[in-house]
A protein has these predicted regions:
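Chalcogenol-based redox active-site neighborhoods
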Residues: 1-174
């Protein structure tokens, strides 16, 4: 995974905001915001990844003008549209189907339980100068303590974007 202080790579990927498809070019959206949160997951419906995304959506962070929030999955935009609806996500869910962007952020899983070249699970916070201010990665099925969104909220606060860390209810094993 990229480390704090490194420059975040630009990218352009297809995605959906709700059920509206479009292209998401990071450079077009990064300008004018104080911080960007990129949530990498292999699939929006992977058990603990789904819990993180649900909590991120419930937090309401995406409704803030100074903050950009995107989920980046290995799913198609069709599956992402369903996930956005099922999880009530208020931010774009973007398809990195071949894990090219995940590779540039060094969060690609080469071979994970029979799945090859998929985005791993991680969170990256980027400042307006494209500098990585927070980076975290773990196994897609791990239930971390504390939840990764606690550290994401702290990194946002350091950038002057005061947000509350959402409570994450992990349902792994259901």
């Amino acid at each position: 995974m990229l480390t704090v202080g490194q420059k975040a790579p630009d990218f352009s990927l297809p995605g959906v905001d709700g059920r509206d498809p479009g292209m998401y070019d990071l450079h077009r959206f990064l300008e004018g915001v104080d911080a960007t949160v990129l949530a990498f997951v292999p699939s929006a419906h992977a058990p603990v990844c789904e819990d993180d995304l649900r909590a991120l959506g419930a937090a309401g962070w995406a409704g803030r003008e100074e903050l950009l929030v995107w989920a980046i999955t290995g799913d198609s935009i069709f599956a992402n549209a369903d996930a956005a609806e099922d999880l009530n996500l208020d931010f774009p869910v973007i398809s990195d189907f071949h894990a090219g962007v995940a590779d540039s952020y060094d969060v690609r899983l080469e071979d994970w339980h029979g799945h090859r070249d998929i985005p791993g699970r991680g969170f990256v916070v980027v400042d307006p100068d494209w500098t990585v201010r927070h980076a975290w990665q773990t196994d897609p099925f791990e239930t971390p303590t504390p939840p990764p969104l606690d550290a994401v909220a702290a990194a946002l606060s350091d950038l002057g974007v005061a947000v509350d860390a959402p409570a994450v209810e992990y349902r792994a094993g259901d």
